[in-house]
Every structure is written in C-alpha cells, then in structure tokens.
C-alpha cells in the first residue's frame, strides 16, 4: 500500500499579486492542510519562471519561512517547480538550488493555446523539453505533470477531447526509457486519470519499475485533498511504494 505524500504544494502567499487579490497560503498553512489531508510526507514549493508574478525573491522568502526557527520541518521538504527550457535546462538551475537549500526540483512545462495555438506543436514542444531535461539536466528530480497542459486545448475549444491517445506513442516510449535510464521520477497529476491511454502509460511505469511522484498541485489549502484520489488511483493500479520517489535531506 502506498504511503500518501504530496511534493507539489504551492505556498502561493509569496507570489506577486494584484492589489486586493487573495493572499494565498503560507508554507505553514499548506503544511497543516496537507497533514490534515493525510499526508505523511509534505513538499512545499513555488514556481520559478519568467513570469513577473514569480520573481526569485518569492522563493527566497519561502525558504526563509521554511528554515525559520519555529517552522516544523519533520517529514517536510522544500522544493521548486522550475519551468523547463527548450534545451532541457530549468529556470532555477543548480546555483539557485544551492542558494535556496532546496531538497528537490520539479521540472515542468507550462504552455497554453495563447502561447502555442496548435495542439500538435504544443505536444512536440513539451516532448522536446522533457526529453532534453531527462538527457542533459541532472538538477531535475521529477518531471511535473507531463503533458498536463493538453487539457487547455479542450477547454479552449481547439479540440473536442484531450487524452494521452493524442500523444505519439514514440514520444511516450522515449520518456519512459529516459526516465528509467536517468532515475528521474514522473508525476501523477492533473486531469488524465480517466483516460485509458494515460492508464496504459502508468501501467508501463509500474511494469518497468520507474520512479513516480504524486502531487496535488495545490495553490490553496482546500486543494491539498486532491492527492487522496490520485494516491488511491495509483494504489489500485498496483504502483509499489518501493518506487515511490522521496526527496533526500
């Protein structure tokens, strides 16, 4: 049986917001919500990318809270969700990781129809970024929500339905091969749990003993419960705790 853990929890209090916007939770608030949801291990992070909402200073402030004298760090880890570039490098880098004293880096791709209008091009770009990160970037411990932005093309009305069956099988096979070769975890996340092709992808993760990680991607305390369903789904699929990735301190 899987131990419930969540390493993709945003302490969004520190990001830059418009005047009057909701403050967002601090690290201690998200930690409490994750523990209340049943998580034994908790990972707290924020975005690192080119957005003006996510300057590096917000990560510095999060790290200061995490390493403050009165913060309970038992079974709790500090990470970052860093955007992947075309060459596979990440927005945080090894220097940023060391400065912030991070325990892990999740490398993710964040795209949308406003940035790349066609689904095929989006899939190609995300695949190449993930592939290059797996081959070249030893700073990245996990690939966050692979192809999790595909649902945006359905919501925008560009395609009638999103699913992993729209991704070329050779792309998925290459990701599986490289993730195993370089011992990088893949994340269960977002909107694909009911898709049969997604299920087959994760059966391959199971059968080939790849590392995996489960995240809620919670930006609010109420969303920390999302990890429960995803953990139950992974458990029912037969994923083993032995390959359930965990950061190192």
Annotate each predicted stretch with a short phrase.
Residues 1-91, 153-166, 174-175, 215, ...:
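An N-terminally biased module of ancient metal coordination in phosphate/nucleic-acid-related enzymes
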Residues 6-10, 44-45, 77-81, 106-110, ...:
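A cross-family glycoside hydrolase active-site/sugar-binding cleft signature
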Residues 14-17, 100-211:
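Domain-core and long-helix interface of multi-subunit machines
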Residues 33-36, 132, 178, 204, ...:
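Alpha-helical scaffold elements within enzyme catalytic domains, especially in hydrolases
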Residues 40-41, 185, 211, 240:
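Residue-level detector of anion-binding/catalytic polar loops
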Residues 53-63, 115-120, 195-199, 224-225:
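Active-site-adjacent beta->alpha loops and helix N-cap segments on the catalytic face
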Residues 72-120:
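Hydrophobic alpha-helical segments and helix pairs
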Residues 225-249:
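Mid-to-C-terminal alpha-helical segments outside catalytic/metal-binding sites
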């Amino acid at each position: 049986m899987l131990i419930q853990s969540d390493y993709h929890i945003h302490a969004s209090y520190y990001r830059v917001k418009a005047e009057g916007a909701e403050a967002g939770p601090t690290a201690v608030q998200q930690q409490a919500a994750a523990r209340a949801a049943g998580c034994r291990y908790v990972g707290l992070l924020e975005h690192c990318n080119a957005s003006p909402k996510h300057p590096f200073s917000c990560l510095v402030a999060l790290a200061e809270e995490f390493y403050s004298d009165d913060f309970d760090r038992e079974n709790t880890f500090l990470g970052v969700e860093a955007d992947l570039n075309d060459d596979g490098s990440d927005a945080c880098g090894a220097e940023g990781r060391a400065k912030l004293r991070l325990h892990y880096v999740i490398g993710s791709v964040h795209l949308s129809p406003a940035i790349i209008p066609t689904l095929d091009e989006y899939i190609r770009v995300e695949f190449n970024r993930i592939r290059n990160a797996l081959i070249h970037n030893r700073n990245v411990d996990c690939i966050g929500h692979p192809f999790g932005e595909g649902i945006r093309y359905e919501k925008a009305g560009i395609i009638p339905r999103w699913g992993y069956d729209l991704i070329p099988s050779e792309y998925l096979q290459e990701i599986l091969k490289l993730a195993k070769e370089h011992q990088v975890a893949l994340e269960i996340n977002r909107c694909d749990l009911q898709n049969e092709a997604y299920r087959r992808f994760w059966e391959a993760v199971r059968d080939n003993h790849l590392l995996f990680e489960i995240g809620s991607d919670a930006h609010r305390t109420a969303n920390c419960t999302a990890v429960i369903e995803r953990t139950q789904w992974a458990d029912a699929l037969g994923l083993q705790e032995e390959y359930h990735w965990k950061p190192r301190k």
